[in-house]
Structure formats: structure tokens, C-alpha cells
UniProtKB/Swiss-Prot annotation:
HAMAP family: UPF0270. It comes from Aeromonas salmonicida (strain A449). This is UPF0270 protein ASA_3305. Belongs to the UPF0270 family.
């Protein structure tokens, strides 16, 4: 199930974004990128509709995935 990011309290959304960024450990190359910049990048992807927040009832978990990943996979097959 998609959770609209606009429906989340701003603190809740920020905590979710920080948790996601820290969990993902995305590599940004030679240059260090601050946590705030990484969070802002994911926030922009949500605002632009490139990413969605997905809740899995089966796994009782929440994740952020690309819109393309969500559109092409059953919700229970989306990587956590």
C-alpha cells in the first residue's frame, strides 16, 4: 500500500527519510555528502513522484522505493 508522503507529520517524514538514507548506505563517489543533503535528495524524489513510500502488511514494514520498482513488482516482492 502506498502511503502519501504529504499525509505524514513533518517530523515523522524526516525520521523516515533519515532512517532510509542511513539504512541504504548509498555511495556518492569521492565526495562526502551530508546526511541532510541525502535526505533532501530522497525528499525531492518523493515530491517529484519518482519514489513512493510503501507499507507492507505482510512484513509489517515501511520502505521507500522508486516508482518504477513499485509499478513493476508485487508489493510483497519489493526489497526491504
Amino acid at each position: 500500500m502506498i502511503i502519501p508522503w504529504q499525509d505524514l507529520d513533518s517530523d515523522t517524514l524526516n525520521n523516515l527519510l533519515e532512517h532510509f538514507v542511513l539504512r541504504e548506505g548509498t555511495e556518492y563517489g569521492e565526495h562526502d555528502v551530508s546526511l541532510a543533503d541525502k535526505v533532501d535528495e530522497v525528499r525531492q524524489q518523493l515530491k517529484q513522484g519518482l519514489a513512493v513510500i510503501v507499507y507492507s502488511e505482510l512484513h509489517e514494514s515501511i520502505n521507500i522505493v522508486s516508482k518504477a520498482t513499485f509499478s513493476s513488482a508485487p508489493v510483497d516482492d519489493i526489497p526491504e
